[in-house]
Amino acid sequence: MSITSEKKKNLINTYAIKEDDTGSSFVQCAILTERISNLTEHFKVHKHDHHSKRGLLILIGRRRKHLNYIKRKFGDEAYQQLIEKLGIRK
């Protein structure tokens, strides 16, 4: 369910704004999206894991807050590019 360090480094390199960027909202959204997709796969097998489902809802809310910040701070264009790149919305 957790992300490997190689996968996290790959996400940081892909979504970083500048070279040593590990904490921007873009990077955090990418990492949260990966964690959410891992938990979603977990729930396909373990349908009654309600404790982890609460954690999933917390992660989704945290990602939503970062996305709202990106939309407010950087504009709709950056927001749309990010959600298309992450594959969040349909």
Swiss-Prot record:
**What does the record note on quaternary structure?**
Part of the 30S ribosomal subunit. Forms a bridge to the 50S subunit in the 70S ribosome, contacting the 23S rRNA.
Q: Name one Pfam family in it.
A: Ribosomal_S15
From which source organism is this entry?
Answer: Wolbachia sp. subsp. Brugia malayi (strain TRS)
Protein role: One of the primary rRNA binding proteins, it binds directly to 16S rRNA where it helps nucleate assembly of the platform of the 30S subunit by binding and bridging several RNA helices of the 16S rRNA.
Q: What keywords appear on the UniProt entry?
A: Ribonucleoprotein, Ribosomal protein, RNA-binding, rRNA-binding
What GO MF annotations does this protein's record show? rRNA binding; structural constituent of ribosome
**Any one cellular component term from GO for this entry?**
cytosolic small ribosomal subunit
Q: Family assignment?
A: Belongs to the universal ribosomal protein uS15 family.
Q: Which GO terms describe its biological process?
A: translation
What is this protein identified as?
A: Small ribosomal subunit protein uS15
Show the SUPFAM superfamilies listed in the entry.
S15/NS1 RNA-binding domain
